[in-house]
Structure formats: structure tokens, C-alpha cells
Amino acid sequence: MPNFAGTWKMRSSENFDELLKALGVNAMLRKVAVAAASKPHVEIRQDGDQFYIKTSTTVRTTEINFKIGESFEEETVDGRKCRSLATWENENKIYCKQTLIEGDGPKTYWTRELANDELILTFGADDVVCTRIYVRE
């Protein structure tokens, strides 16, 4: 079983602004969000299939607790409440489908994958995919 536990810092990010656009975030808020999310700090605790993930930026801190295969509540990248279900896509990759609790919007998901001692995080909104690569601190 892969070990996601540890603290992670972002090395690169692609398409974050495009992702926010696809989610309908206005230009002013996108500018603030892109600046704030340029140096996120991620802490992951893992006990088998049980995960705790805390992501901190200068503007916002999010925390999620979940177990693979059990639905849980969290927020989409743009802050809307959703019901999520994380599953193992393969032995090193978690896929999490998000379903909005209220309202309409693009189909969203995230993945987290360990590869070559890097954490590869993707956020998807319909056809737009943001990829962020993290390294251990």
C-alpha cells in the first residue's frame, strides 16, 4: 500500500486559472485565488484506507477526513458543498468523484497519485484538468 503520509510543498501547477474559469469563478476572485494558492502546504495522515488531508494557503485552510469506499462531505475547489466518494483507481492512485449537494455545475473530481516520490494532484471540472505536483518537505 502506498504511503501518502507526510508534509508536501508544491513544485509546479498547470491550468489552475483555467480550472477556476470552468467553475465560473469571476476574474477578480480568480486573481486572488491563484496568488493565494501559489504556495499551498499539504499535510497528509494515513492509516490504511483512512485519510486526513489538510491544505493550507494564505487565504484558506481546508481539512478532509475520509475512508476509501465511503462517501463524505467536502467542498469543491470553488467552495461549494459536495458529496464525495474516493476509490483506489490503481495501487498508487486515489480517484474521488464529487457530486454537488445543491445547484448545478460542471462534473468535478480530484485524484492523488504517488509516483517517483512525488504527489500528483489533479482537479477536474468537465474537460478542464489542473495538475499540481508536490514534493515531500
UniProtKB/Swiss-Prot annotation:
GO MF entry, a single one: retinoid binding
Compartments where located: Cytoplasm
Summary of the function given for this chain in its UniProt record: Cytosolic CRABPs may regulate the access of retinoic acid to the nuclear retinoic acid receptors.
Alphabetical GO biological process terms: fatty acid transport
Descriptive protein name: Cellular retinoic acid-binding protein 1
Keyword annotations from UniProtKB, A to Z: Cytoplasm, Retinol-binding, Transport, Vitamin A
Gene giving rise to this polypeptide: CRABP1
Matching Pfam families: Lipocalin (PF00061)
A GO-annotated cellular component: nucleus
Family as reported in the entry's similarity comment: Belongs to the calycin superfamily. Fatty-acid binding protein (FABP) family.
UniProt-listed CDD domains: CRABP1
